[in-house]
């Protein structure tokens, strides 16, 4: 069923079947119900409950909250990809897209971070947290995503170099592809250990000490190059609870310099980082 909201804000209730829902331009409350639904919230500060089923949700501009419930779901924190094939592709603007909250729930879900201060919770089962650009364009406010429940035994960080939507528009995806042979594989070189033991691996997890900044972490390792990823215990940044520290993911853009793009709240201690492996990092 095709359901369209008004541009004045609306309550939208989906059917038990497979729905296509377009929320409009104002603040919406959307309950999609059962079925495999496609939901485009549009502008405004929206509350979206996708319900059971394999759902695809685009939050749109504004600070939105998405509850996906059960099923294998695909959640976008902003309007990064079209609901209809005729929609124009997004170009990253010179401003944030809103600070969104995504709860994926049970199922093997894909959560796609935007360029706001997003909060992502994957829920049960193996989830993929997708990042498409490592630092905002000039003129934006630098924000990074918080991942609340990364499970090192089954979850993965996916770093997008070719555009998750498939059209390889590099304006929307600027990670460097370090996969084993073809996009979608695990990272090709990986290191987990003391900072002085790292020598140019494409993903480096530092487990012997923490750092107060991404630049300090980059300075502590040797032979880092643009596009490498550093994971370190953050001594400075507090998690969403305002009390505990966590792990930070940073993108190297030059020697001794890196940008933080994600914070993992539940990896509280350096000892938690020792369980990270190459299988926790993939490239598109």
From Swiss-Prot:
Q: Do you know which InterPro entries this protein is assigned to?
A: Hemolysin-typ_Ca-bd_CS (IPR018511), Hemolysn_Ca-bd (IPR001343), RTX_toxin/Mannuronan_C5-epim (IPR050557), Serralysin-like_metalloprot_C (IPR011049)
Residues annotated as region Disordered? 1-27
Claim: Manganese is one of the keywords in the record: no
* This protein's UniProt keywords: Calcium, Metal-binding, Nodulation, Plasmid, Repeat, Secreted
The source's superkingdom equals Bacteria
**Record's subcellular location:** Secreted
An example Gene Ontology CC term for this record:
extracellular region
User: What induces this one?
Assistant: By naringenin (flavonoid).
UniProt cross-references to PROSITE patterns, sorted A to Z: HEMOLYSIN_CALCIUM
Q: Where is the signal peptide?
A: none
Instruction: Please describe what this protein does.
Output: The NodO protein may play a role in nodule development by direct interaction with the root hair cells or some other plant surface in a calcium-dependent manner.
Q: What is this protein called?
A: Nodulation protein O
Species this protein is from: Rhizobium leguminosarum bv. viciae
For this protein's source organism, the top of the classification is: Bacteria, Pseudomonadati, Pseudomonadota, Alphaproteobacteria, Hyphomicrobiales
Q: Which gene encodes it?
A: nodO
């Amino acid at each position: 069923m095709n359901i369209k909201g008004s541009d004045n804000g609306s309550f939208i209730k989906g059917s038990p079947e497979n729905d296509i829902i377009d929320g409009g331009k104002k603040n919406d409350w959307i309950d999609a119900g059962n079925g495999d639904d496609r939901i485009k919230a549009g502008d405004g500060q929206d509350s979206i409950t996708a319900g059971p089923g394999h759902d695809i949700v685009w939050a749109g501009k504004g600070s939105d909250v998405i509850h996906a419930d059960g099923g294998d779901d695909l959640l976008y924190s902003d309007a990064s990809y079209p609901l209809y094939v005729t929609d124009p592709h997004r170009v990253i603007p010179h401003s944030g897209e809103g600070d969104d909250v995504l709860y994926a729930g049970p199922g093997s879900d894909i959560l796609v971070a935007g360029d706001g201060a997003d909060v992502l919770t994957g829920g049960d089962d193996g989830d993929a947290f997708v990042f498409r650009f490592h630092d905002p364009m000039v003129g934006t406010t630098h924000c990074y995503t918080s991942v609340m429940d990364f499970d090192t035994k089954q979850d993965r960080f996916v770093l997008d170099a070719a555009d998750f939507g498939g059209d390889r528009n590099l304006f929307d995806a600027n990670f460097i592809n370090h996969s084993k042979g073809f996009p979608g594989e695990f990272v090709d070189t990986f290191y987990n250990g003391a900072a002085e033991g790292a020598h140019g691996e494409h993903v480096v997890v530092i487990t012997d000490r923490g750092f107060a900044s991404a630049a300090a972490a980059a300075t502590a390792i040797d032979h880092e190059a643009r596009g490498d990823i550093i994971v370190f215990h953050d001594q400075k940044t507090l998690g969403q609870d305002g009390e505990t520290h966590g792990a930070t993911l940073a993108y190297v853009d030059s020697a001794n310099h890196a940008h933080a793009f994600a914070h993992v709240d539940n990896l509280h201690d350096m000892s938690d980082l020792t369980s990270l492996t190459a299988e926790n990092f993939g490239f598109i």
